[in-house]
C-alpha cells in the first residue's frame, strides 16, 4: 500500500470518517472532524504506525488542515 493511502487510512480511523479519504482537501478542523484530542491521537497513531515523530510544536493547524497537507508534511518528515 502506498504511503498516502496508509496515512489516509490512519486519519479516517482517528476521525471516524471516510470523508477524509473521499475528499483529501476537506478542512478537517473547520468541518469538526478533528479536535485537539483527536490531534494528539493522530500524532500518536502516526508515530506508532510509521515511526515518524511530530513534535506538537511543529503542528500548525493551518499547515495540517487537510488530508493532503498532512500527507505532504509527513512525507517531508519521513
UniProtKB/Swiss-Prot annotation:
Pfam family, any one: PP-binding
SUPFAM superfamilies: ACP-like
Keyword terms: Cell wall biogenesis/degradation, Cytoplasm, Phosphopantetheine, Phosphoprotein
Pathway: Cell wall biogenesis; lipoteichoic acid biosynthesis
Superkingdom as given in the UniProt entry: Bacteria
One Gene Ontology CC term in the entry: cytoplasm
GO biological process, one term: lipoteichoic acid biosynthetic process
Carrier domain span: 1-78
Modification comment: 4'-phosphopantetheine is transferred from CoA to a specific serine of apo-DCP.
GO molecular function annotations of the record: D-alanyl carrier activity
Compartments, as annotated in UniProt: Cytoplasm
Function: Carrier protein involved in the D-alanylation of lipoteichoic acid (LTA). The loading of thioester-linked D-alanine onto DltC is catalyzed by D-alanine--D-alanyl carrier protein ligase DltA. The DltC-carried D-alanyl group is further transferred to cell membrane phosphatidylglycerol (PG) by forming an ester bond, probably catalyzed by DltD. D-alanylation of LTA plays an important role in modulating the properties of the cell wall in Gram-positive bacteria, influencing the net charge of the cell wall.
Family label: Belongs to the DltC family.
NCBIfam families, sorted: dltC, PRK05087.1
HAMAP family registered for this protein in UniProt: DltC (MF_00565)
Name assigned to this protein: D-alanyl carrier protein
Organism: Bacillus velezensis (strain DSM 23117 / BGSC 10A6 / LMG 26770 / FZB42)
Gene that this sequence comes from: dltC
Amino acid at each position: 500500500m502506498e504511503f498516502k493511502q496508509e496515512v489516509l487510512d490512519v486519519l479516517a480511523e482517528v476521525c471516524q470518517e471516510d470523508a477524509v479519504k473521499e475528499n483529501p482537501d476537506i478542512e478537517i478542523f473547520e468541518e469538526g472532524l478533528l479536535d485537539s484530542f483527536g490531534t494528539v491521537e493522530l500524532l500518536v497513531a502516526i508515530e506508532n504506525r510509521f515511526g515518524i515523530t511530530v513534535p506538537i510544536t511543529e503542528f500548525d493547524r493551518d499547515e495540517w488542515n487537510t488530508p493532503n497537507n498532512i500527507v505532504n508534511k509527513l512525507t517531508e518528515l519521513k
